[in-house]
Amino acid sequence: MKIGMIVAMDKELKQLRPLFPENQVIIQKSGIATVNAAIQAVEMIRQYKPDCIISSGCAGGNGDDINLQDVVVSSELTYHDVYCGKAIDETTVYGQVQGLPVRYQADPYLLEKAKLTGAKPGLIVTGDWFVDSKDKMREIVSHFPEA
């Protein structure tokens, strides 16, 4: 299986590069933000045609069962900083881009493989806002208490 991995920052790249031989895992830095990650994913697909792409990085956490340096993998994903309003579609919810899924499900095969390593599965919320205060964290948790 050809695996691609995208990280946002140099420090993440430096931590992961020694763990994976270049002939086994393609690791590239996208820069911070979801648009940069999406662009990097498209370029990685064009150039290397990986079987899967893993987005990896440092993140905060909300669960009492999560400790510093735990590995958390998504069972599902959504945005914490998207709200399109209800003007066009009454069924759109916070975190959903209109016309797209409320949440994106992880690949079941990859999720099971990750769980075998001890990684903790759960909802991951992402966005283009660095959560640097307790108030912002409380706001996110109010929308996604299970995250």
Positions of predicted regions on the chain:
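Glycine-rich phosphate- or other oxyanion-binding loops that anchor nucleotides, phosphorylated ligands
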Residues: 2-3, 7, 14, 18-147
